[in-house]
């Protein structure tokens, strides 16, 4: 039963290491904006630099058809309708996921995201955490340290999400969110629906199993339904 539950997760064969090449893991959009400051903390679904060897030639959330259609840019557009002067930061932390057990050792590379001074943090991490022998207690401990690092004065509202594909760590995220009184956006059902993926659009099966435009739209809509309360 467990193997069936996580079958979609196992189709994510995109290497979790070095997803950005030599590109920076922290990027900004309208850094000096005077409106709400939104930080996206994520992985390849949030941002993946070009990787021609798997047929991915773009520099946005895998596997949207264009920049405007990934969930980050859809949320940016929705926020800007309310606050045209909003500021945004993307912190791509797939490397943290792969070694979450010792994730604290990696936090220094995210210092620029810490200095951004976020008002809202969208936590979109779990998919690249190794599912075999996943340690929920260690994950919660390290996630808390990471979020505390990115939110040093505690002013930011953190919004948690579960995996796009069902993951053994989803329960740890939900438990952490409940104990910290944080909103949780569940996404795992999307990864069970091939219409939410980029199936048939990429030869590499791992890329194709990432969210396509419809999946990205659904991710953005679910997050914004919670996020708008804090704008």
Question: What function would you assign to each model-found segment?
Answer:
Residues 24-39, 47-133:
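Conserved SGNH/GDSL esterase-like catalytic core that processes O-acyl groups on lipids
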Residues 11-18, 66, 96-99, 158-161:
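Short linear motifs at secondary-structure transitions and domain/linker junctions
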Residues 1-41, 45-64, 80-81, 115, ...:
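N-terminal secretory targeting modules
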Residues 2-5, 19, 92, 101, ...:
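Residue-identity detector for glutamine
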Residues 69, 74, 81, 103-231:
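Alpha-helical cap/lid subdomain in secreted, periplasmic
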């Amino acid at each position: 039963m467990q193997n069936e539950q996580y079958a979609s997760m196992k189709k994510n064969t995109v290497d979790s290491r070095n997803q950005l090449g030599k590109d920076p893991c922290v990027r900004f959009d309208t850094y000096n904006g005077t409106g709400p400051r939104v930080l996206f903390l994520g992985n390849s679904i949030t941002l993946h630099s070009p990787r021609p060897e798997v047929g991915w030639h773009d520099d946005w959330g895998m596997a949207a058809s264009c920049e405007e259609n990934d969930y980050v840019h859809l949320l940016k557009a929705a926020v800007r309708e309310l606050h045209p002067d909003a500021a945004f930061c993307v912190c791509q932390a797939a490397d943290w996921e792969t070694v979450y057990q010792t994730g604290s050792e990696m936090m220094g590379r995210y210092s620029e995201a810490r200095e951004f001074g976020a008002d809202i943090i969208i936590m979109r991490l779990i998919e690249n955490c190794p599912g075999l022998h996943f340690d929920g207690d260690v994950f919660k401990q390290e996630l808390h340290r990471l979020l505390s690092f990115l939110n040093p004065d505690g002013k930011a509202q953190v919004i948690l999400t579960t995996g796009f594909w069902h993951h053994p760590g989803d329960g740890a995220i939900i438990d952490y969110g409940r104990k910290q009184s944080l909103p949780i956006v569940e996404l795992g059902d999307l990864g069970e629906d091939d219409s939410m993926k980029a199936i048939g659009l990429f030869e590499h099966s791992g890329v194709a199993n990432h969210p396509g435009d419809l999946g990205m739209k659904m991710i953005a809509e679910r997050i914004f339904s919670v996020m708008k309360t804090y704008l």
